[in-house]
Every structure is written in C-alpha cells, then in structure tokens.
C-alpha cells in the first residue's frame, strides 16, 4: 500500500470548469496517471466529516486512528483506479471543498483548483443537461448564487494552502497552453513534456476516458478556444444585469461583468499574474 506521504495530485473546482481537460493533460504526461472521476471520494469525504465527533473520540478512536483509516481507503481507491505510475492523480471536482482534510491526510500532496467564468460554467450545465447537486437549471440566478458560494469556499481554502494549491484559469489554459502547462508542471515538480500539449492524440493509450464523465467527448479534441464564447446570447438581460449581486466573485476573479460579450484576451497577457492578488 502507498503511504500518506506520497506526492498525490488532486484536481478540483466547480463542475464544468475544465477539470476533465486538466486531468487529460496530466494523463498525457509519461509519469502521471489520473484516470476518470471516481464519483465517490467527495461523498466519502462528506461522510467521514460526520463521524468526527466527540462520540467517536470517547470510544477510543482518536483522530489519528480515524485519519489513518480514511486515508487508507482513499489511497486504495486512487491507487487501484487504474495503472500505477510514479505520480498518481485524482480528479473529482468537489474534492476542492475538502482541501484542509486532504492537506492533513496527505501533507505532500498538490492541488490544482480550476477556475472558469461562471457564465460559461452555468451555460454548460444547462446546455449539456449536466445534473449537479444544488444547481436548479430552471432558475439561472440561483445557479450563480450557488457557484459564488462554492468558488468562495474553494478559493479561501486554496489561499490558505500556499505551496500546496495552485489556481488555474481555464481561459488562460486554452489560450496559452504551453506557458500554463509549464507553470503547472513546475508547481507539481514534474519535468515538462510536450505530450501534454497533444493529449487528444493519446486517447485510449496514455489517456483513458470515462464515458460517464460529461466532458469526455469534448476532451477528445485538441486544446482549443471554441468554448470561450459559447455562452454569449444565452442569458437574459435581467440575469446579466444582476451578476455583481448574485455572483460578486466573478469580478473579484477578474471577469468583466459589464459586458454581455467580454473580451477574454486579457487572460493571455504576459503580465496576467502580476495583477492576480489574494484570490489568484
């Protein structure tokens, strides 16, 4: 069995934020294996939190014992979810809500938090009929409120894990893939591989796809910018007018909420990260 000190890689974020693309890119690296979503670990992390009570401690099961049991389960799932590799990776979007727990269980792990314009995220959920708990597709504005709640918590946790969590903007990744992938591999202490720019050519070989993942069909294509503007003209004027109220973290993250057709070229600027402060 692998130890708790393995340099595991976790990829998370609000669903439809580019997590599947990110894990496909990582899977293309010769030393990394992610595989598809387990669709289990976020629920398991929620379950284990409910058992961390005084009742458990009073029964003689200390947090250390409980942590060992929890990490043993998670490690087995990740390790036997596919072929072994020098660096193992997990992509379940909502693990991003459990970063402090992951930090404690796996002190040498690294986390990639994917960030994407909420308008594109929510349009994707609605258009592709992706069922995500807590998102009511018949009420657009409530979906923006839910996104804001989740990304706020994810960002807070990521910002409290310096050196262990990196934020990756989807809009930059697809416009400046080589620079961004090099930034990511540096963070992960991996040697950069040109294969990562061509993940689509390795589908079925280095990169296994899970047909249950809603983005599986999309990542069969090369990295492209087609999805950047797919949400244009898809929201009501009333919804767009209220964005700063229902999803204030859009502007905090640098997205232009004043335009119904924003220009994403700023995310490709060479000095982009110089202007990312607490939330970047």
From Swiss-Prot:
Keyword hit for Cell membrane: no
PANTHER family according to UniProt: PROTEIN-TYROSINE SULFOTRANSFERASE 2, PROTEIN-TYROSINE SULFOTRANSFERASE-RELATED
Disulfide partners: 34-89, 158-165
rRNA processing is among the record's keywords: no
Domain of life: Eukaryota
Residue numbers binding 3'-phosphoadenylyl sulfate: 16-20, 116, 124, 128, 170, 215-224
Native source species: Caenorhabditis briggsae
Family under the similarity heading: Belongs to the protein sulfotransferase family.
EC number: 2.8.2.20
One GO term describing the cellular component: Golgi apparatus
Positions annotated with a glycan in the UniProt record: 57, 136
Descriptive protein name: Putative protein-tyrosine sulfotransferase
Gene that this sequence comes from: tpst-2
Keyword annotations: Disulfide bond, Glycoprotein, Transferase
């Amino acid at each position: 069995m692998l130890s708790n000190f393995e340099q595991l890689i976790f990829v998370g974020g609000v669903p439809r934020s580019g997590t599947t693309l990110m894990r496909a890119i990582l899977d293309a690296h010769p030393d990394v294996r992610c595989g598809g979503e387990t669709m289990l670990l976020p629920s398991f992390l929620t379950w284990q939190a409910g058992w961390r009570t005084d009742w458990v401690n009073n029964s003689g099961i200390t947090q250390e014992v409980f942590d060992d049991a929890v990490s043993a389960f998670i490690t087995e799932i990740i390790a036997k979810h596919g072929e072994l590799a020098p660096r193992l990776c997990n992509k379940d979007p909502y693990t991003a809500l459990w970063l402090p727990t992951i930090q404690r269980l796996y002190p040498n792990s690294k986390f990639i938090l994917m960030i994407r314009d909420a308008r594109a995220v929510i349009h994707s959920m609605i258009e592709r009929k992706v069922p995500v708990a807590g998102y009511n597709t018949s009420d657009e504005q409530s979906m923006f409120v839910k996104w804001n709640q989740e990304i706020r918590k994810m960002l807070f946790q990521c910002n409290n894990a310096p050196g262990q969590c990196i934020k990756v903007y989807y809009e930059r990744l697809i416009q400046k893939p080589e620079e961004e992938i090099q930034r990511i591999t540096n963070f992960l202490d991996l040697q950069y591989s040109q294969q990562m720019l061509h993940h689509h050519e390795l589908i079925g070989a280095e990169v296994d796809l899970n047909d249950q993942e809603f983005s599986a069909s999309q990542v069969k294509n090369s990295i492209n910018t087609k999805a950047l503007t797919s949400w244009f003209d898809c929201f009501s004027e009333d919804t767009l007018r209220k964005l700063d109220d229902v999803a204030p973290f859009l502007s905090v993250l640098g997205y232009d909420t004043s335009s119904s057709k924003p220009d994403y070229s700023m995310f490709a600027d060479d000095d982009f990260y110089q202007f990312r402060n607490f939330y970047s």
